[in-house]
Structures are given as C-alpha cells and as structure tokens.
C-alpha cells in the first residue's frame, strides 16, 4: 500500500489549504489516481488496523438496496450513524441508486398530443451482470450513485459516485471515480470495499481479478487529522493480506459476511480520528 502512503505525502507537500462544508478545513489536491494490482494481494491498509466488519457489512448493505441503518446496527457497524435521521433512514443513497435508480417508462395512452409516462426503476447491478454475460467486451459496464434529482433528499450525497468495469484478457478490472476523498478515514475503507466488490463480481461471472483503479476528484486531509497522518506515515507498510471466498456463490446477492476470509492481515494499531460531518 505504498501508493496510499505516497498520496498522503503528496497532499502534505502540495495540498492547498481550503475551507469546506463541515467547517473543519482541509489540505486538498484535485485529481489523483492510484492503481492496485489485486494479484499482489488484497489492498487493505496495514499501517493502521481497519474494521473489516464495517467494510464487509456496508458493501452487503449497499448491494441489498437498503438505505436504513438498522441492518448495520444489528451487525455492529456504526459508520453511518451521524447521518441517519431518528428512524435510521438516509434517503435515496447508494443502495437505492444501485438497485432502484429512478426512470420514466412510456405508458399506454396520451394526454392530448403528449405521451404518458409512469415511474419505474433500474436495477443497475442486475443489468450490469446481465451485460457482462451478454457483452463482456462492452465499455458501458457502469454503475452510478450520482442522481442530481435525488441529491437534495440524500443524507449525504455519494462521495464514491461512479464505477466502471472493463474485462481485458480474461481479467476483470474496476475503476472508481470518487468526487470527494477523505484520505485518512474514508479512503482506506473505499479501497478495500471496491476491491472486495471486484472480487465478488469476478467470482460470480467466472473472471480473474485484475486491477482496482482509484480516481479521486478532491483528495483531502482534514486539518484535525494531520497528526494522525504523520503518525501513520512514520510506519512502514507490510505485506498485503489475501482474500479468500469460502464457498462457491453464484449470485452477487447471495454473499454473506461469513463467506469472506482475510488471511495474513497483521496491521499496526488503530489510529483514531474525528469524523467531519
């Protein structure tokens, strides 16, 4: 994970001091990219311990289409607590957009000379899998969580907003575009989450895993994370762990938490930092 350390150092060296929505303040760089070859290991940061339970359960929650934190709370995951309302709802965030992206469908009849439409939805994950099977060479294997019409109703607009698959030479690759990247707290989770998603998609479609490409718009370190970042950079990255999927799963929607084993993960101690809300 030297790429991640290099990105942190680059922002410390070249970042611009900015204000932000949370009022915390950041050092920011615009337009950064890292590439992780999953053949070299599972990209889980080793210079601080990450909460694997949160990473896995959050991804399963996204894929289920759920947008209430009840499932997360039942499984010991609290990373969305600050944004949920009193009922645990977050509005039409990631899971909703991935599985029920709103669309208008042509209906029967007209209103005067105008056609009639009815409200429908697109299950982007199911359509993606169908397209992989029918057109594996497609350059349209894209899922988006950014829906301008729904952004005002979201507790937190999607930071990791769009991702694309590409299958080349029998390997499946995934590129994520992340509009806003909290480099210390959020990005290590995002890297692991989308690497896990790539493993899951490759598993159910029969491809080898290739690379995870992480493209970031605003990559920033919050002003109250500076000492934590410097502590992390004082530590040396260790060998990456390996991911093992414990059973043969045929549907992306059938994975369970127990299906994933992380082998050889020997991280340095946790480094705590406040979340900017």
From Swiss-Prot:
**Cell location:** Cytoplasm
E.C. number(s) listed in UniProt? 2.1.1.45
Record-linked InterPro entries: Thymidate_synth/dCMP_Mease, Thymidate_synth/dCMP_Mease_dom, Thymidate_synth/dCMP_Mease_sf, Thymidylate_synthase
The residues responsible for catalysis, as annotated, are: 159 (nucleophile)
According to UniProt, the reaction catalysed is: dUMP + (6R)-5,10-methylene-5,6,7,8-tetrahydrofolate = 7,8-dihydrofolate + dTMP
Q: In which pathway does it act?
A: Pyrimidine metabolism; dTTP biosynthesis
By its UniProt entry, which Pfam families does this protein fall under? Thymidylat_synt
Keyword Transcription set for record: no
- GO cellular component terms given for this protein: cytosol
Which regions span the lipid bilayer? Answer: none
List the signal peptide residues. none
Which CDD domains does the record match to this protein? TS_Pyrimidine_HMase (cd00351)
The UniProt annotation places (6R)-5,10-methylene-5,6,7,8-tetrahydrofolate binding at: 51, 182, 276
User: Which residues are noted in the entry as dUMP-binding?
Assistant: 21, 139-140, 179-182, 190, 220-222
* Assembly mode: Homodimer.
The role this protein plays is: Catalyzes the reductive methylation of 2'-deoxyuridine-5'-monophosphate (dUMP) to 2'-deoxythymidine-5'-monophosphate (dTMP) while utilizing 5,10-methylenetetrahydrofolate (mTHF) as the methyl donor and reductant in the reaction, yielding dihydrofolate (DHF) as a by-product. This enzymatic reaction provides an intracellular de novo source of dTMP, an essential precursor for DNA biosynthesis.
Q: Which family does it belong to?
A: Belongs to the thymidylate synthase family. Bacterial-type ThyA subfamily.
State the protein's name.
Thymidylate synthase
